[in-house]
A protein has these predicted regions:
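Conserved phosphate/metal-binding and DNA-contacting active-site motifs used
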Residues: 2-194
Length: 194
């Protein structure tokens, strides 16, 4: 199956507040709203996505969940016993997670949500994928700083589940999870829909 056959995700993002769940769209939107992680996780479930609570960084960029995660896992490590295998789309369970861990970052289970993400490390790779017929989609500016973006696509039902990590070029992932807005990166920056 060619890249051109991939469909856009069915969750347009408001260009004013950058939220996939904005009901005011465009000029009627009051602007960026900081929803709680719990409220946002529940909004993702309404989109048909499965979520998982993740560790969060404290004000110093250290592990905020109290489990002593090291720097590369702060803000990214799952808080449940079985990690991404515990992801859920059940409102009561998700509400309980964020009642227990109100500051938890949000992870989106790509496989169960039927998504795949492309994370290029340079703008040239976007041109490469566009030349292959990959259409525009919703985008997350990750907390990793300038030039770090996640391009979300709906995975066709017959597409394989995979993870390609070409760390100096790009990552393509339809397995595992991605950290999602409004999560906080260890740097203190917030993941944002753009």
């Amino acid at each position: 199956m060619g890249m051109a056959e991939n469909r856009l995700i069915d969750a347009p993002v408001c260009h004013v507040c950058a939220s996939p769940s904005c009901t005011n769209r465009g000029d009627k939107c009051p602007g960026p709203v900081t929803a709680s992680p719990r409220a946002t996780a529940l909004q993702y479930v309404q989109l048909g996505w499965w979520v998982i609570p993740l560790c969060w960084p404290d004000a110093r960029g250290k592990c905020g969940c109290g489990r002593g995660h090291q720097s590369q896992n702060v803000g990214k490590a799952p808080l449940t016993k079985h990690g991404v295998r515990d992801s859920s789309d059940q409102v009561i369970l998700i509400s309980n997670w964020w009642t227990k861990w109100p500051n938890a970052n949000i992870g989106i289970d790509l496989k169960r949500s039927g998504l795949f993400v492309i994370a290029p490390d340079s703008p040239e790779w976007l041109d490469h994928f566009a030349a292959k017929g990959l259409t525009p989609t919703v985008v997350v500016k990750s907390g990793g700083g300038e030039g770090h973006f996640h391009y979300y696509y709906r995975r066709p039902p017959d597409a394989p589940i995979f993870r390609i990590n070409r760390s100096s070029e790009y990552d393509i992932q339809s397995d595992g999870y991605m950290v999602a807005p409004p999560s906080r990166h260890v740097s203190g920056r917030i993941y944002l829909w753009i």
